[in-house]
C-alpha cells in the first residue's frame, strides 16, 4: 500500500484503520525502521519479513560501490574494462552466459579482488536457497566470518543483517 508519507505515525494510522488487523499474520517490508516500529506497536502478533529483494540489493549496491572505488585507482582503459562488466557483476552466476563467464574470467585474472567481491556476493545470495531458518543462519554466519577475515567492504552488510536478523531470517518461516 502506498501512503502519503513514510513516517511512523502515518503508518500507524494506516495500520490502525485496517479492518480485522488482528488477523494479519505476516507483514513484508523493506528495512525502514519507522515501518518496523509501527508494525511492532500496532500488530504485535504479526511476523515481519524483510523482502529478500531489498536484502540482496544491499550487497549489489556495495559491490557496485566497491567497483567504483577500484576504478578510481585505475587508468581510463582499465576503468572501461571493469565498467564493461558492471551489469554482469550484479547478475546471478547461474544466469550468466558462456560469453559473460569468459569476460568475467578475464577481468578476474587482472583484478582478483573483484572476483572475491563477486564470489562473496553470490555466496550471500545463495543464503536464500536454504530451505529453513537454521540452515540460512548457519550459512550466513560462515559468510560473515569470511567477510570479516577477507573482505572488509562487506562489513556494512553484516552490520545491517545483524541489526535486522529476526526480520530477515523470518523469510525462511514465511517465504514471500
Residue positions per predicted region:
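Acidic/histidine-rich catalytic cores and adjacent linkers
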Residues: 5, 12-49, 56-57, 76-176
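Short alpha-helix plus adjacent loop in nuclease-associated cores
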Residues: 55-76
Amino acid at each position: 500500500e502506498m501512503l502519503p508519507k513514510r513516517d511512523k505515525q502515518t503508518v500507524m494510522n494506516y495500520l490502525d484503520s485496517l479492518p480485522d488487523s488482528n488477523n494479519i499474520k505476516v507483514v513484508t517490508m523493506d528495512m525502514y525502521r519507522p515501518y518496523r516500529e509501527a508494525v511492532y506497536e500496532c500488530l504485535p502478533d504479526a511476523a515481519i519479513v524483510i523482502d529478500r529483494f531489498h536484502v540482496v540489493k544491499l550487497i549489489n549496491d556495495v559491490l557496485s560501490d566497491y567497483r567504483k572505488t577500484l576504478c578510481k585507482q585505475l587508468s581510463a582503459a582499465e576503468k572501461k574494462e571493469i565498467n564493461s562488466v558492471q551489469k554482469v557483476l550484479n547478475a546471478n552466476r547461474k544466469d550468466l552466459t558462456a560469453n559473460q563467464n569468459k569476460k568475467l574470467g578475464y577481468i578476474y585474472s587482472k583484478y582478483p579482488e573483484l572476483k572475491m567481491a563477486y564470489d562473496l556476493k553470490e555466496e550471500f545470495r545463495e543464503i536464500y536457497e536454504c530451505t529453513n531458518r537454521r540452515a540460512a543462519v548457519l550459512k550466513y554466519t560462515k559468510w560473515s566470518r569470511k567477510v570479516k577475515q577477507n573482505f572488509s567492504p562487506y562489513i556494512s552488510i553484516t552490520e545491517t543483517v545483524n541489526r535486522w536478523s529476526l526480520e530477515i531470517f523470518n523469510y525462511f518461516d514465511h517465504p514471500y
